[in-house]
Amino acid sequence: MDDGRKGIFMSVKKNAHSGEHAHAGYMMKGWKLRLLRLLALLIIVCVGAAACSKKDNDTAQEPFTVKLGVLLDFSGDKKEESEEMYRAVSLAVDEINASGGVLTEGYSIELIKKDDAGDYMNSVAGYYQLAQEGACAVIGTNNSKGMEELVKASASANVPVITPSVTDDSIVAAADFIYQSCFSDKYMTEAMASFLESGLAASNDNLSVALVCPAENERCTALYEDMAAAISSRNISTVYAHELSDYTDEKLIELFDGIVSSQAGYVFIPAGVDDIEKILSAAKQCGYSGSFLGLPEWYGYDSDTHGYDVYIAMNMAADRDTDMVGAFIKKFGAVVSDGVRPAYDSVYFIRDAIEKGYLATAASIALKLPFLEGSTPLGDYVIGAYGNIEKTVDIIRKIGRAHV
């Protein structure tokens, strides 16, 4: 073979070998790419599986619960009252959870406790915090100024508030998301007038009343007007009516001189607990021999030192031998708060509102709840936007704390 042909042959052979090597290189690179892609896919699958597993574990560890907020004065002047109401709420929650929870899914109820320390600004801040934390309803508060502010807050957050202790009709009537589990002021005066007319007030058969209107605030005026209307519709006479500008000794002596002259059998003064001592002392000094009709706030005051019978409207008489009182004392100890039964009923009201479709489990719907009637292990309840005409009221007599 001549050198030319040999060179051509060697060149072709070399090129052929080069092509084979190139093909093999390409094949190797392809496998490497496939391996890399496979590894990447495996990593993605493993990460996804781990994430799903973590999500499943988180779901298993944190089941859905119905959250209820409890917003009360746990560190201020009403600390003891608030703790008793909270224990009553806890009792109802334990009963509901033990009996299967809420809805057919059996959701448990979880309480979120907030302290407003009796300050209306804390009431608003606490309410919004509870709404953000997922509360479907809030039980509280037990300060009137705080309730007034929650009228505005609840209108924007649409999370309803159920108060176990604020009886002021004007607050509730002005709101779409405020409800009373306690009785209202208007119904309280109706109940007291019916009580007098029934003749159950055995300590005094003189069915005549002196009505006093303290010029303090709108609630006092409303209570005076409600009692006047309740008495006028019954066989009870109003023999004296007086507007009281302040609680100075001079004004109170002038007041009771007039009441003694009128020979009124009962005196109704919608005054706060801080003024009771002055009122009863002035009555004693002037020789008044009748009885008093008091607000629920008067219950904690010891009137025995002056010898007067003071009849008080209560949501539940703490010294009465009822199933509610018995169950509560058995579980927690003594009962002194008038808001215990309303606080307890509030939980069942919320449970029933959810199960009847008026209240969602995550947030309330933007509709005003109607009156709801329901039952608890300790009795029936009626709770609504205002009025609460069907509520049971205990009238107690503060001399030896005898229930009448």
Regions found by a protein language model. Name each.
Residues 280-344, 355:
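Extracellular/periplasmic periplasmic-binding protein-like sensory domains
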Residues 70, 130-142, 162-164, 208-213, ...:
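Periplasmic-binding protein-like
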Residues 69-90, 114-120, 143, 216-221, ...:
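Extracytoplasmic "Venus flytrap"
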Residues 49-51:
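C-terminal motif of bacterial Sec signal peptides marking the signal peptidase cleavage site
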Residues 328-341, 351-400:
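Segments of small-molecule ligand-sensing domains
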Residues 56-60, 80-87, 102-172, 244-253, ...:
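Beta-alpha junction/loop-to-helix N-cap segments that form part of ligand/metal-binding clefts
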Residues 170-195, 306-318:
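Short beta-strand elements at the ligand-binding edges of bilobed clamshell
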Residues 178-243, 350:
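An alpha-beta-alpha
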